Amino acid sequence: MRSRKLTGGVRSSARLRARSYSSASLASARDVTSSTSAKTTCLASSSHKATDRRTSKKFKYDKGHLVKAELQKLDPKSDISSLPKVAPVAPCENKFAEDSAEAAVSVPESREPPQGCSTPASEEPSVKAENGLSTEPSSAAAAQEPDDSSAGQAEPVPRTEEVRASVLQMDSSIFLDDDSNQPMPVSRFFGNVELMQDLPPASSSYPSMSRREFRKMHFRAKDDEDDAEG
């Protein structure tokens, strides 16, 4: 009976232990699952945040890229507008310049006589005639120059006529009218002022005297008058 009771007690204790172990294992499993679920939620949230950041960065990069592309599209137009406009060179002008250059090159070649041909004898008289014509006008011009110089020396302009002309010009001006408020010229009262400037200053006949001497002379004259009256 006792052995049965002991075995029954051992079995019950083993059952209790098994139950407690199973409950502990279940609790630990629940903790593990809860921790894993928390980790998964954290990872999911972090992954969502990372994806959001990446998408925002991509959006910003795309925006910046689009803005740069638009600016690059606009820049060439502004560069083209800022460049100075060069007038297009007409092709006919280039052809005309080339033709004139070819003609200038061909003219001296045509002037040179071909080989084996002698110069015509008619050129020598023409050269002589040209020399004669060129020397004749030069001699005539040389003969006219001394005649002009002698005529200029033989006709000097008198100085008095120049002075009279200047006086007449002064009198014919607008500011010398009788009704105007301008002062009259000095030459009308005193003659020609230019001739008066060369004259020496008028010398005083009496020497300069002091004020005392002048007063003495004045009192003496008064005394003489009183004596004459008395």
From Swiss-Prot:
Give the source species: Mus musculus
| Ranges of compositional bias, category Polar residues | 31-48
Subcellular location, principal:
nucleus
Residue spans of biased composition, Basic and acidic residues class: 49-78
Asked if Phosphoprotein is a keyword of the record, the answer is yes
Please name the InterPro entries in this protein's record: UPF0688
Tell me the segments the record calls region Disordered: 1-85, 97-166
Task: Write down which residues bear the modification named Phosphoserine.
Answer: S180
Question: What family, per the record?
Answer: Belongs to the UPF0688 family.
Give its localization.
Nucleus
**What is the protein name stated in its UniProt record?**
UPF0688 protein C1orf174 homolog
Gene Ontology cellular-component terms listed: nucleoplasm
Q: Where is the composition biased (Low complexity)?
A: 11-30
Keyword line: Nucleus, Phosphoprotein
Nucleus is among the record's keywords: yes
